[in-house]
Each structure stands twice: as structure tokens, then as C-alpha cells.
């Protein structure tokens, strides 16, 4: 098995720490860190300044990053909009559709969504009177049939996560979108790929998604930069979320005219260093290849599931064999307390519902522990986790607190 840890300086600085929280944010390879440092130490110019060969370099990196993102998901260059992250991307899309929605229109979501794919649509419900419909039934993981049952003449938008934030479920966006559009071709579909694009390939042309969102920091890139993919014909119809320099081609005392392409969504100076880091992360991932990444993750996660299944006190939730996330609880111990105990053993996990607060309608718990694996995890990480769980004694969760 490849030692991917060697590419991540975090492990050199934290030799005794096990990192199992990649669903929250990924660690960064040295090439990403170097690219960001290069920007600040060698360039540090604004990408909108193209008046010299020196400043043009940063403009080229911005364009190269956009081109690589487009290649990454098989989109067109001018369908990629840079944002601060998936949260802003979802807000941008919901707000952009505001003029085209009215009272009584229906937006379909699921119980497994992150708050970022709930609140922007809830805001439209509060402001416009649109109706929110949840596809899946309580106590059930969403299935294709759930989406198809709730499609109606009033359905305008379907927005769902292709990978669950908490329980690591995987939805087949190709199958779901294909069948939704068979019933209602004009419905707009948004895929939140934030928790899955770091693990598998996406093809927006194949799946025919109208929108897709994700964040760079989940796939080895820097924080503060993300992507909203929007189909070209929709970009022209949507209003911007924010207004500022660079998005208009004319302005006077009484009027202004915006570009009718992706530029109208990118007012102001962007996260320039983020372009450098994100571009390096994309190249790093493409050099390794998703087949190797997925194969590596499956081996590690299967081993972890098999080992956890041997511990009577452990309960796991909605296990998807293709997911790199495992959600569990320890019988009789509050999840945050047990996560604190693991933390005292230098094992980083996440407790709670991880911003997917309404998921308790599916898994019937108010608190769980999430261990999420990525390319830099190995069997030793799993062994350390299992050893710590087996060594737990009642009261150990209070270590370091009292």
C-alpha cells in the first residue's frame, strides 16, 4: 500500500496524532502549501491586472484553475463560478433562482442534507411562500423511488447531496437526475458534491445536472474557495448574490449593465492565493488518479467497519460499503464525551450531527461519532482507533476535563 502520508507535512508535525475528520476538512499536501507560499512571496498581484507580463501570471493561474475545475467535472470553462465555498455556492444558486419562483412552487430536499443545502431554500420558503418537500420518508434513507413519488407539476427545484455529511451515504446522481427529468424535463436539479467529489469522479454532462457545488478544502485544497457549476443557459437568467467591481461592462450615474456570463457572479477581488492552492490540489489528485484513491479508501474503511463490528458496545449507522465515512456510537456514553476520550488518545473524530441536524429523522439519534477516512489514512490509524475503543473504561471520558 502506498504511503501517502509522506506528501503531507501535517504528519511530520503531529507524529502521534490520528486524523479521522476529513469530512470536516482535508489535510494539505506540501505542493498545495508551496503553491500558496509562492503566490505571496513571488507574485502577490491581482488577477484583474493584466497590464504587464509579471502581473499576467496571476491572471493565467486563475484561468488555469478554472480550466482544471472544468476538466475535473467535464464542464465548460465558462460554467465554473468561484465562490468562498459550497455554502456560498448554494446561496448563490438559491438567490439566483429567486425571480423565477413564486408562492406554491415546490422544492424537493432530503432529510440527510447539510444545513447549507437547507437554509437557503428555507429562506425562499419564508420570503416567497414556496413549499419544501422532503423526498424520503422518516426512518428511511432516500432512494430513487422517493424522489420520483414527490415530483409534481409544481416541482421547480430538486437539491440533494450525492454524499452524506454525517452517515456517508452515496446517491447515484446520474440515475436520480435521469429519471427525474423523464417525468419533468424542466425541473432544475442541484447536486451538492461537497462530501463526494474528493472520493470519486463526476461528469456534469453525463448526469445532466443543472447545478453542482463543492469546496476546495474538502479535496486537499485551501479554505475559502469553492465552486458553483451552473449550466450556461441558466447563468444568463440568474441574478447575482453580490455586487462589485469586475462584474459590469458599463456603469454611469443612472444605470449599469452586467456581463451575462460567469463574471457577473464574481464581483470583487477573489481569493487569489486560493487559486494557486486549489490548482495544485487538483493536479495532485489527477496525478494520483481516482481509481487509486477509491481503492485505497475502500480497503481502509472496510477494515475499520469489520473491526468495529467485533466490538459489542459499538453501534454503527446506515453503513454504505462505498463510503469512506463511518458513523457510530458507544453504548451508554454520550457521543461528545466519547469523542473527547478519543481525543485524549490523540485520535481526532467528530461528534454531534455535523450540521445535518434533521438527519435524526433517519437514524433516530441526537448524537453520533463520525470517523472519516481519506487517502492519507492507513491500517495503523484504524488499529489505533480500535485499540482506544477497546481500552475504554467508564469514566475515561472525563480525563482532561476534571
Curated annotation (Swiss-Prot):
Cofactor(s) needed for function: pyridoxal 5'-phosphate
InterPro entries, per database record: Aminotrans_V_dom (IPR000192), PyrdxlP-dep_Trfase (IPR015424), PyrdxlP-dep_Trfase_major (IPR015421), PyrdxlP-dep_Trfase_small (IPR015422)
Reactions performed catalytically: (sulfur carrier)-H + L-cysteine = (sulfur carrier)-SH + L-alanine
Enzyme class: transferase
Organism superkingdom: Bacteria
Single Gene Ontology MF annotation: cysteine desulfurase activity
Chain segments annotated as transmembrane: none
EC nos: 2.8.1.7
Keywords from the named record: Pyridoxal phosphate, Transferase
Sites of N6-(pyridoxal phosphate)lysine modification: 218
Biological function: Catalyzes the removal of elemental sulfur and selenium atoms from L-cysteine, L-cystine, L-selenocysteine, and L-selenocystine to produce L-alanine.
Family membership: Belongs to the class-V pyridoxal-phosphate-dependent aminotransferase family. Csd subfamily.
Cross-referenced PANTHER family: CYSTEINE DESULFURASE (PTHR43586), CYSTEINE DESULFURASE 1, CHLOROPLASTIC (PTHR43586:SF8)
The protein's name in its UniProt record: Probable cysteine desulfurase
Origin species: Ureaplasma parvum serovar 3 (strain ATCC 700970)
Amino acid at each position: 500500500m502506498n504511503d501517502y502520508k509522506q506528501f503531507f507535512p501535517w504528519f511530520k508535525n503531529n507524529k502521534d496524532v490520528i486524523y479521522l475528520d476529513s469530512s470536516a476538512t482535508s489535510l494539505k499536501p506540501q505542493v498545495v502549501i508551496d503553491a500558496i507560499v509562492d503566490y505571496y512571496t513571488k507574485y502577490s498581484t491581482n488577477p484583474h491586472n493584466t497590464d504587464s507580463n509579471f502581473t499576467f501570471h496571476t491572471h493565467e493561474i486563475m484561468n488555469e484553475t478554472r480550466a482544471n475545475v472544468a476538466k475535473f467535472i467535464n464542464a465548460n470553462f465558462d460554467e465554473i463560478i468561484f465562490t468562498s465555498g459550497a455554502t456560498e455556492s448554494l446561496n448563490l444558486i438559491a438567490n439566483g433562482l429567486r425571480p423565477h419562483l413564486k408562492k406554491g412552487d415546490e422544492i424537493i430536499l432530503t432529510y440527510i442534507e447539510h444545513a447549507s443545502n437547507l437554509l437557503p431554500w428555507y429562506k425562499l420558503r419564508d420570503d416567497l411562500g414556496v413549499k419544501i418537500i422532503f423526498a424520503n420518508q422518516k426512518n428511511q434513507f432516500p432512494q430513487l423511488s422517493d424522489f420520483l413519488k414527490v415530483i409534481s407539476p409544481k416541482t421547480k427545484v430538486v437539491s440533494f447531496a450525492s454524499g452524506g455529511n454525517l452517515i456517508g451515504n452515496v446517491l447515484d446522481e446520474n440515475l436520480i437526475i435521469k429519471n427525474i427529468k423523464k417525468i419533468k424535463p424542466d425541473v432544475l436539479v442541484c447536486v451538492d458534491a461537497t462530501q463526494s467529489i474528493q472520493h470519486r469522479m463526476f461528469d456534469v454532462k453525463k448526469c445532466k445536472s443543472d447545478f453542482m457545488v463543492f469546496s476546495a478544502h474538502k479535496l486537499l485544497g485551501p479554505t475559502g474557495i469553492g465552486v458553483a457549476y451552473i449550466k450556461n443557459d441558466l447563468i444568463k437568467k440568474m441574478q447575482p448574490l453580490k455586487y462589485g467591481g469586475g462584474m459590469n461592462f458599463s456603469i454611469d450615474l443612472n444605470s449599469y449593465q452586467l456581463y451575462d456570463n460567469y463574471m457577473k457572479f464574481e464581483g470583487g477581488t477573489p481569493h487569489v492565493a486560493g487559486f494557486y492552492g486549489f490548482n495544485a490540489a487538483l493536479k495532485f489528485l489527477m496525478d494520483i488518479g481516482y481509481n487509486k484513491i477509491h481503492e485505497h479508501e475502500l480497503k481502509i474503511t472496510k477494515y475499520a467497519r469489520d473491526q468495529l463490528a467485533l466490538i459489542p458496545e459499538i453501534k454503527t449507522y446506515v453503513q454504505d460499503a462505498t463510503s469512506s465515512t463511518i458513523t457510530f456510537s458507544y453504548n451508554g456514553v454520550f457521543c461528545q464525551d466519547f469523542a473527547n476520550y478519543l481525543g485524549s488518545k490523540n485520535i481526532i473524530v467528530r461528534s454531534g450531527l455535523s450540521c445535518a441536524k434533521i438527519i435524526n429523522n433517519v437514524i433516530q439519534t441526537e448524537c453520533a461519532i463520525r470517523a472519516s477516512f481519506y487517502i492519507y489514512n492507513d491500517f495503523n490509524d484504524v488499529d489505533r482507533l480500535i485499540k482506544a475503543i477497546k481500552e475504554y473504561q467508564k469514566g475515561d471520558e472525563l480525563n482532561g476535563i476534571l
